[in-house]
């Protein structure tokens, strides 16, 4: 059912998913999302490289060489292209009115490189004015077990999940979904959001706290870009359902690791603990 009217609702309940830039021989992202197609969703590929198109079509996936040719509204795209190409893909997605996209592509501000920072700022400057729902970059994107959208080929498909999980780490997102599923605890929705340059943790919490398919919210967070908003959103969420927060970067070594991992700046631990107590 989701949260009709919420800016993230189409992305969390997609009817059309597009994988951009997948490559053989495994075609990981298309293979991960085959259950979405099998459940009746529209799964398409956008790939310009002629060497890859035959392999994509052998999977039974229709490929397009232009975003403008993809039929119907694009609810969610998974983008796996070199970082220098990312702004061009984002431009095309915005031009066709796509709702949102997860950018698996890394190599942005988390590297500390001038080019990476510049490219990340370019994505932000393009996405925000367009009100485009950019997940990431440097992330695994969405896992929606009820409709068959996955960021890992072993993640279970299940209709009974009631746990919403958010993770700034792709590895933690994958491992939690696998371990939880192996122990009979299925997820309702999961987002791995990496650098969180447009959509921040607060945006996902705001959705999950209103989602009647989610009874409890768990999260792994390395940092919030707007601490006050995160506090207010978390406070409201806790009135509605249980929330479990796992904070990364709590030591000096951990803080350095999160900076190089997702570009998250360390926050004062006492301030963080005070916020959690409130």
Residue ranges of model-derived segments:
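Catalytic-core regions of core metabolic enzymes
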Residues: 1-278
């Amino acid at each position: 059912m989701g949260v009709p009217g919420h800016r993230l609702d189409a992305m969390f309940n997609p009817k059309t998913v597009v994988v951009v830039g997948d490559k053989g021989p495994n075609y990981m992202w298309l293979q991960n999302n085959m259950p979405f197609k099998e459940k009746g969703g529209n799964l398409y590929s956008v790939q310009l490289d002629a060497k890859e198109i035959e392999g994509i079509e052998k999977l039974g996936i229709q490929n397009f060489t232009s975003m403008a040719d993809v039929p119907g509204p694009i609810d969610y795209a998974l983008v796996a292209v070199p970082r220098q190409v990312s702004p061009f893909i984002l431009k095309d997605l915005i031009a066709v009115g796509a709702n949102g996209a997860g950018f698996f592509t890394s190599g942005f501000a988390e590297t500390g490189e001038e080019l990476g920072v510049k490219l990340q700022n370019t994505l932000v400057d393009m996405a925000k004015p367009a009100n485009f729902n950019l997940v990431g970059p440097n992330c695994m994107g969405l896992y929606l077990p009820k409709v068959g959208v996955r960021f890992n080929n072993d993640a279970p498909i299940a209709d009974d999940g009631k746990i919403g999980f958010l993770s700034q780490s792709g590895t933690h997102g994958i491992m939690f979904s696998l371990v939880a599923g192996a122990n009979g605890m299925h997820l309702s929705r999961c987002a791995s959001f990496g650098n969180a340059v447009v959509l921040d943790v607060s945006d996902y919490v705001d959705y999950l706290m209103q989602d009647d398919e989610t009874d409890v919210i768990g999260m792994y967070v390395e940092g919030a870009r707007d601490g006050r908003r995160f506090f207010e959103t978390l406070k409201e969420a806790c009135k509605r359902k249980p929330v479990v927060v796992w904070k990364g970067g709590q030591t000096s070594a951990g803080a350095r690791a999160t900076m190089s991992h997702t570009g998250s700046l360390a926050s004062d631990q006492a301030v963080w603990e005070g916020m959690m107590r409130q």
